[in-house]
């Protein structure tokens, strides 16, 4: 079992990663002699459970702020075992909530993004919430003694907008979002990310461990043949997915 120094994504001391420490150490060697992660990292349920608790509990990017630029615009994501959505309220604030009705626990939103008007309605028993998460309608509950709608609003999740990116923190304990983004903020500013508008999007459903997808994205040895346009902008051997600053920047 390997240990870990520092803090996890939520800012707390992490529990040991359920992989052989020697295998992990080999992946951290200089690239000339480093090895890949062991197979267990991609198929062991205990490893995935560790990742959900130690990685996905902290700041996670939900998407670009343009998706929630208008009142009622929303983004919905499945983060580990938890379904979350963000939306812009009538007061102009972007908030995040658990995508779970307070009545019987039904999923409220099923699309990954879209637009609602002034109400978010559960498809099961039609409980309705305003864009600030307050319960505004609960059919047949007026007959229930001591039922206080103000106590049954959606459960809010800590969120922030940094550099045009909507972030959520399921733990509620992660470090300051600006600290999490760190030096990447300068790149977000340089490319004017908050001002960008998405022209189109493509969704891929892949039956694979998330790290396999991440590794494919982060290595570019395949770029000369598969992505010649990107390869013309960034030397594939540098492993950089952005262009170098010009003397004028």
Feature map (PLM): residue ranges:
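A conserved active-site cap/scaffold subdomain adjacent to cofactor or substrate pockets
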Residues: 198-240
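A general structural signal for short secondary-structure junctions and capping/turn motifs
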Residues: 52, 127, 149-151, 157-160, ...
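Intrinsically disordered or highly flexible coil/loop and linker segments, enriched in small
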Residues: 60-61, 193, 222-227
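Conserved small/polar residues in nucleotide/adenosyl-binding loops
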Residues: 242-249
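Alpha/beta-hydrolase-fold enzymes
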Residues: 172-174, 178-207, 213-215
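N-terminal pre-ligand scaffold of iron-sulfur
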Residues: 2-112, 157-160
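Rieske [2Fe-2S] iron-sulfur-binding domain
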Residues: 68-172, 178-187
């Amino acid at each position: 079992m390997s240990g870990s120094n520092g803090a996890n994504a939520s800012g707390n001391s992490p529990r040991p990663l359920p992989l052989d420490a020697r295998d992990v150490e080999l992946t951290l060697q200089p690239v000339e002699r480093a090895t890949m992660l062991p197979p267990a990292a991609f198929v062991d349920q205990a490893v995935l459970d560790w990742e959900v608790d130690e990685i996905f509990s902290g700041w996670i990017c939900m998407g670009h702020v343009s998706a929630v630029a208008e009142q009622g615009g929303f983004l919905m994501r499945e983060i580990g075992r938890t379904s979350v959505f963000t939306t812009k309220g009538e007061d102009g604030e972007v908030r995040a909530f658990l995508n779970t009705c307070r009545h019987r626990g039904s999923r409220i939103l099923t699309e990954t993004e879209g637009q609602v008007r002034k109400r978010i309605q559960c498809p099961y028993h039609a409980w309705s919430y305003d864009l600030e998460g307050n319960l505004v309608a609960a059919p047949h509950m007026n007959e229930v003694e001591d039922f206080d709608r103000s106590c049954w609003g959606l459960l809010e999740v800590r969120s922030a907008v940094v550099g045009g990116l909507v972030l959520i923190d399921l733990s509620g304990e992660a470090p300051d979002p600006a600290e999490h983004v760190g030096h990447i903020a300068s790149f977000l500013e340089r490319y004017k990310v908050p001002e960008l508008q998405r022209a189109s999007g493509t969704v891929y459903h892949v039956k694979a461990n998330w790290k396999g997808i991440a590794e494919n994205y982060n290595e570019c040895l395949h770029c000369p043949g598969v992505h010649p346009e990107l390869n013309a902008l960034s030397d594939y051997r540098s492993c950089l997915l952005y262009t170098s600053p010009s003397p004028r920047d």
